[in-house]
């Protein structure tokens, strides 16, 4: 896929100035007959050299933004192009000043830190109230509108409590901005809104002191220090930081999520009412934890276990998760087992349709396994990681389309592994799958190793 240029037209939208070039996507201002429109288009970066996570992030962002009620704390999704044809998101253009502009002139006055932080906390509270966790909070992803409201952008790594988390289900490494990432995110936990409060604390720390609380980790080993190493108290770096602000910041940055604030609304209240902030020993802390305490934390870091994720704001009844194992084209192992792939696909579809008719709550996870990206050979977009990923997603969607299920009940996963059975079993274990539907050569081994019920499907003789 070539890089879009200003002046290009996509589905009737004309691209204007490129506003942002990120690692996963480009953002363009859109043009109308009389000049710039109050809209932007986000286009995922696909093609040679681009990782498959770009596709996953695009799908995640589309689902989350589409589910949020219209409001000032996030951009409104206007239109989108399907991943099968031309993927893009058309969103409201947010006028405002980025938090990164204030950050460039840090340290800031405590009153300014509190005002900016309180508005940001209210924005977080609003998305948390709708069961969304941002999980990629950084100064570049926060804007302040002319009216003063904080607006969160870039929901490509976000989690929605009522939608499948494609990143949690397919990615095994920490994703997000390492400078602000919470300890539980490092361990792959993406369902806790208190992770956003940790990132908020890191931003407040940087605004108040001009320094990052944990520096800029460049290796996984450096990142894991966050499981046991607390930051230097802000007042030790800048005496002008008041004790109430240090109390708020360090409470947000607690390693144990149970020791943080319970909600972003509480953070907003404390920042707006400094005189009412209850001071603990955090407020007067002048040094990091002593070497003995740090040593003990480090020794127990290997077994560090955050508290379970809190219930959703609007807790829904648990719905069973059903994994359907499919294979299309050049996957690692054939599902055929002597029968045609088309016949087996239809048999699987028929079995899933019966299940959905019996249980209207179940979620269907359609998955296929492909070789790792390093095993790709050949030229052109089809031989790239993103090209192959999209091709397999298209096949999965085509298989599922006749089921006529609501979008929130279907997910599509392209798993990379040289061992297809192990990949399917790992997916089922990590995502607490309740039942697996499988056909062909993989069926016996999957059935013997699966952590859940397995239905082995065969095509009818006439098929």
Region locations from a protein language model:
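AlphaC helix of the eukaryotic protein kinase fold
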Residues: 48-67
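Activation-segment/catalytic-loop signature of the eukaryotic protein kinase fold
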Residues: 80
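Conserved short submotifs of the Hanks-type protein kinase catalytic core
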Residues: 84-98
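Activation segment signature within eukaryotic-like protein kinase domains
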Residues: 116-117
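Protein kinase catalytic-loop region centered on the HRD/HxD motif
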Residues: 122-132
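Structural helix C-cap motif within protein kinase domains
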Residues: 209-213
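Small/aliphatic-rich secondary-structure junction motif
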Residues: 315-380, 449
């Amino acid at each position: 896929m070539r890089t879009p240029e200003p002046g290009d037209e996509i589905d009737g939208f004309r691209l204007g100035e490129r506003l942002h070039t990120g690692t996963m996507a480009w953002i363009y201002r859109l043009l109308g007959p009389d000049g710039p429109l109050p809209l932007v288009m986000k286009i995922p970066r696909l093609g040679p050299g681009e990782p498959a996570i770009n596709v996953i992030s695009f799908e995640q962002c589309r689902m989350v933004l589409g589910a949020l009620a219209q409001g000032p704390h996030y951009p409104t999704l206007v239109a989108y192009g399907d991943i099968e044809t031309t993927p893009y998101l058309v969103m409201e253009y947010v006028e405002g000043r980025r938090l990164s502009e204030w950050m460039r002139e840090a340290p800031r006055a405590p009153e300014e830190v509190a005002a900016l932080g309180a508005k940001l906390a209210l924005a977080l509270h609003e998305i948390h109230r709708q069961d969304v966790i941002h999980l990629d909070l950084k100064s570049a992803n926060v804007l302040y509108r002319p009216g003063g409201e904080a607006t969160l952008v870039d929901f490509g790594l976000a989690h929605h409590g009522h939608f499948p988390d494609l990143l949690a289900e397919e990615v095994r490494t920490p994703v997000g901005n390492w400078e602000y990432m919470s300890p539980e995110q490092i361990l792959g936990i993406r369902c806790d809104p208190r992770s956003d409060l940790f990132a908020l604390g890191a931003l407040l720390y940087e605004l108040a002191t001009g320094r990052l609380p944990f520096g800029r980790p460049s290796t996984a080993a450096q990142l894991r220090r966050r499981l046991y190493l607390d930051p230097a108290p802000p007042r030790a770096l800048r005496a002008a930081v008041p004790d109430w602000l240090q109390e708020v910041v360090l409470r947000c940055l607690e390693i144990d999520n149970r020791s943080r604030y319970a909600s972003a609304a509480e953070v907003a209240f404390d920042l707006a009412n400094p005189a009412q902030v209850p001071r603990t020993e955090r407020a007067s802390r002048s040094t990091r934890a002593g070497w003995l305490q740090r040593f003990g934390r480090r020794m127990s870091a290997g077994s560090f276990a955050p508290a379970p994720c809190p219930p959703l704001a609007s807790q829904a009844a648990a719905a069973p998760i059903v994994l359907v194992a499919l294979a299309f084209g050049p996957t690692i192992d054939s599902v055929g087992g002597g029968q045609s792939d088309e016949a087996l696909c239809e048999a699987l579809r028929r079995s899933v349709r019966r299940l959905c008719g019996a249980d209207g709550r179940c979620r269907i996870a359609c998955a296929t396994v492909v070789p790792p990206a390093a095993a790709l050979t050949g030229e052109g977009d089809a031989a790239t990681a993103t090209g192959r990923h999209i091709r397999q997603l298209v096949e999965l969607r085509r298989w599922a389309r006749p089921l006529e299920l609501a979008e929130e009940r279907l997910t599509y996963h392209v798993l990379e592994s040289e061992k297809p059975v192990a990949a399917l079993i790992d997916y089922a274990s990590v995502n607490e799958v309740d039942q697996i539907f499988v056909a062909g050569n993989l069926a016996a081994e999957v059935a013997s190793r699966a952590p859940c019920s397995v239905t082995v499907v065969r095509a009818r003789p006439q098929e």
